[in-house]
Each structure stands twice: as structure tokens, then as C-alpha cells.
Amino acid sequence: MLGRSLREVSAALKQGQITPTELCQKCLSLIKKTKFLNAYITVSEEVALKQAEESEKRYKNGQSLGDLDGIPIAVKDNFSTSGIETTCASNMLKGYIPPYNATVVQKLLDQGALLMGKTNLDEFAMGSGSTDGVFGPVKNPWSYSKQYREKRKQNPHSENEDSDWLITGGSSGGSAAAVSAFTCYAALGSDTGGSTRNPAAHCGLVGFKPSYGLVSRHGLIPLVNSMDVPGILTRCVDDAAIVLGALAGPDPRDSTTVHEPINKPFMLPSLADVSKLCIGIPKEYLVPELSSEVQSLWSKAADLFESEGAKVIEVSLPHTSYSIVCYHVLCTSEVASNMARFDGLQYGHRCDIDVSTEAMYAATRREGFNDVVRGRILSGNFFLLKENYENYFVKAQKVRRLIANDFVNAFNSGVDVLLTPTTLSEAVPYLEFIKEDNRTRSAQDDIFTQAVNMAGLPAVSIPVALSNQGLPIGLQFIGRAFCDQQLLTVAKWFEKQVQFPVIQLQELMDDCSAVLENEKLASVSLKQ
């Protein structure tokens, strides 16, 4: 049951094949078994079981709230959850319990979803590996998959299997690991420059970033207000569409959401005709750093559309080379502004120094933020200095408009959907990932994803195939603004063609037992 899709489990609940409480208990048991993945910061066991009990009563009375009623979900720990600690994986917010739910969280709960817990991330969502949070790094479930382990055994130069685990990508790595390890059926991430799509690609999942303004940001602790979007992580496209149907729509608490009513639910056709589509391949995305395997799969995907009668053309996004630098300036500038609220006065951490208000501010922020966050604040403040404002921030805003116009021009030329890589390569081992600093890694990992956020477009990463190492590789589809349903329809067709092999639940469980046993043995040897 845990290996099924959200839609399948929803049908099973409606048919009485399993109860919400039984399903909840299965997921909670698996969360405990896979604790070593470090996917969750907080497990809301009591809350979930109470919600399951209420869901069970509704099913017995024939009053189901819909497809999400009784479905276990997880939420990234930068979304406010009433009565449940919300930390952003930072010392600054340790112990902070919000008095309200983020709009997207409330919408899921209103549909009867069961909140299993809050998932791990890079501190304040600043990173691309889920390695920089105060609660420690997240381990990719594929590190313990049969596919990856068998490939590693064939490599005589492989290092110790237990220490050479893989990153999930980030910053929504905890949400990706939670779904990939079958502890829930869907999870909320956030996506500012690729933070939902990147871990989806590394964990073999569907990672969907909606159009900016389609889904409310109220209650999402902000990183970059003009780019942040709640993201959705699921095991298949249909499931992402179900969750989107619950989340999309106007919100009076978020002035950036569209005011027009949204056509819901987002039903995707079982059979789609792609023969009339025009697929665009951005030539600027063929970068030297792109791995040969990803490049090959990208080319095969284009051929697949062509073989079905679709028109595949090369397009140009001429300002792509400026996008990473532009993104860095705008991102850090907004970070500097947003992080100013954490001053030790209203909520969150406060230091013991009381010599002066200024000294208290400085010490609080020094103790509360890690080096990555402080570094981005410093960069942003530099760009916002009076003497730098015009040369950096204003110029970056102008370049952002040029980047957005590149996409508009591509779509106006007749292109329906753009097809690109999501990441440069498959997931890398943690020990290799941390050889480079956060800033360098983020610039590399966001290369194909951040421009979409600056343009406000919908995008989805779809798992395509396993690499020669037995690891997932994803490709990205980018659509026109507010054509999210069309984008997901194309993605569903593609998903059906590639038939991506998921991790088998039993294989993961066997490895969980082995890892837990190794940890116990290590603990015993340390005590001796």
C-alpha cells in the first residue's frame, strides 16, 4: 500500500480496503525505521493520528472530503504550522511555534490530509544539497537502493558504502526524501531557484513549481518574495495535479495571487495527443559542465516527442549566461531585507547580551544564523548600499526583465513547452558535495532552474531513467505562465512513455534494517 500512488491509495480508502488510521500507522512506522535518512525535523505523530481518526469517521459516515482525505503528507519546515514547531532548520527559530497555518497547509488540512511532520532543509532554504541545516544533512534514499548498491559492487574503487551516501539536492531535500522513502504520498517544498525541482531530480520524483501567483505564499517564511513559490513533490504527475487542485486559487492574505477563479480540479487526460505540440530546446542550456548521460537522455527525450509527430525546434534564450549572476544579486538583496525581521525582539532566538540594543541585535544574529545565511545577508546589503544600488540591484532588475522576455519570445514563436535538463548530473556523494562551498554549489545546481523563477513560469522535473551508477536523472519541462494544466498534461504523457523504475519498498526496508544494525554495532563498539 505504501508503494502506491496517492490516487490509488485514495481509491483504496474510499473502497474500504484500508482505513486512514491503518495508513497513518504504517507511515509513522516507516518514518521511525528510516530515521537515519534525517528527512524529518519534527514528526507530528499525535496530530496525524487524531486527524486520521477524524478522517475515519467521515469515511464511515459517507462524508469524505475528497481525494486527499486520509492521505499522509509532509510539509517543509519553512511553512508555518499552528501549534507545531517551525524552525527553518535554523538556531534562530528553534522553539518557534506559529499561531497560524500557512494557507497551503490549511488548504491541505481542510481537504482531510494527515500531517505526518515537518521536513528537513538547508537553513532558511539557502542551499542546493540539504546539507547546511542545523539538524544535519539529509540522506538520499537511493543511497540504499538495490539499483545503486549493485552498481557500486561492480566498481572495485568504491569506498565504504555506509559513509559514501548521496545528497538529496535542495533545499527541499527532506520533503523529497520523505516521499521517495514512502513515508508519505506528497510533500510541500518551496521553490525560489529550483529548490523543489532539484531534489526531485536527485530522488526520482516529480517536482512541480507552479506559476508565480497561482498558489498562496502566505505563511511561507520568505526567502525571496518575488520568486518564492510553494512546490509539490509526488511520485507521479497525476498526484501533483491532485495536490495542485487543492492548493491553487486566490488568497486575500497574499496580494500576489491571481484574483480570477481557477478552474479546478486540475484533471489530466488519460491519453494525450502530443503530435500538434511544438517542443523548444534552448541551445544555451547545452553547457560544458552537463554530464554526457544527462545530455544523451535530453536528446532521446526530444527524439521521443519527434517520433510521436511533435515539432521539436532549437530556440534561443540569449540572456541565459547572465541569469545566475542576476539571480545572485536579486536573491541576496531580498534575503538581506527579509532576514532583518529576525532581531531578537519579536520571536525566535535572543542572546543574553543586554549592553545595548545594537549589541543584542548583532549577537542574536551571529548566534542564530549560520555562515551561509550571514554571507548572503552581507552580499545583499552590499548590493543595496546607496553607492551600489543603481549599478547592481537596479541593473539586475533590468536583466531580469530581459530574461523573462526571452521566454515570452520563445513561446510567442510557437513553442508550447520547453524541454531542458533539471540538473547537471545525478546526485553526488555527500563527501564530494561538501568539497565546494554553498555559493559555488548553488550556482552550479541552479543553472537550469533559477531563470524560471525570475520569469514566474511553471516548471516540472520528471524522472527519466537511471544513470550508469543506478541513480535517478530528471528532465525539466517549462510552460507558459498559468498554463500549468497543459504543462502537467505533457509531463504526464512523457512520464508514461519513459516508465521510470521506482525504488522497491522491500529493497529499501532491507537496507534500512542493515543500516540500523550497523549503527547499533557502531554504538556498542564506541561504548567499549
Curated annotation (Swiss-Prot):
Listed EC numbers: 6.3.5.7
Protein location:
Mitochondrion
Matching InterPro entries, A to Z? Amidase, Amidase_dom, AS_sf, GatA
User: Where primarily located?
Assistant: mitochondrion
Effect on the protein upon substituting residue 133 to V? In COXPD40; highly decreased glutaminyl-tRNAGln biosynthesis via transamidation
Q: Is Acetylation among the key words of this record?
A: no
| Cystines in this chain | none
In terms of superkingdom, the source organism counts as: Eukaryota
Q: Mutating residue 117 to E: effect?
A: In COXPD40; highly decreased glutaminyl-tRNAGln biosynthesis via transamidation
Instruction: Tell me the enzyme class.
Output: ligase
Q: Where is this region: Disordered?
A: 148-167
Catalysed reaction(s) here are:
L-glutamyl-tRNA(Gln) + L-glutamine + ATP + H2O = L-glutaminyl-tRNA(Gln) + L-glutamate + ADP + phosphate + H(+)
GO MF, one annotated term: ATP binding
Provide the active-site residues from the annotation.
Answer: 76 (charge relay system), 171 (charge relay system), 195 (acyl-ester intermediate)
Q: Output one GO BP term.
A: mitochondrial translation
Gene Ontology terms: cellular component: glutamyl-tRNA(Gln) amidotransferase complex; mitochondrion
- Keywords, in A-Z order: ATP-binding, Disease variant, Ligase, Mitochondrion, Nucleotide-binding, Primary mitochondrial disease, Protein biosynthesis
NCBIfam families found in the cross-reference section = gatA
Q: How does it assemble?
A: Subunit of the heterotrimeric GatCAB amidotransferase (AdT) complex, composed of A (QRSL1), B (GATB) and C (GATC) subunits.
Q: What does this protein do?
A: Allows the formation of correctly charged Gln-tRNA(Gln) through the transamidation of misacylated Glu-tRNA(Gln) in the mitochondria. The reaction takes place in the presence of glutamine and ATP through an activated gamma-phospho-Glu-tRNA(Gln).
Q: What HAMAP family does the record point to?
A: GatA
Assigned protein family: Belongs to the amidase family. GatA subfamily.
Q: Which disease is it linked to?
A: Combined oxidative phosphorylation deficiency 40: An autosomal recessive mitochondrial disorder characterized by prenatal or infantile onset, fetal hydrops, severe hypertrophic cardiomyopathy, poor growth, sensorineural hearing loss, hepatic dysfunction, lactic acidosis, and decreased activities of mitochondrial respiratory complexes I, III, IV, and V. The disorder is lethal, with death occurring in infancy.
Query: What is the protein name given in its UniProt record?
Result: Glutamyl-tRNA(Gln) amidotransferase subunit A, mitochondrial
Q: What organism does this protein naturally occur in?
A: Homo sapiens
> What taxonomic ancestry is recorded?
Eukaryota, Metazoa, Chordata, Craniata, Vertebrata
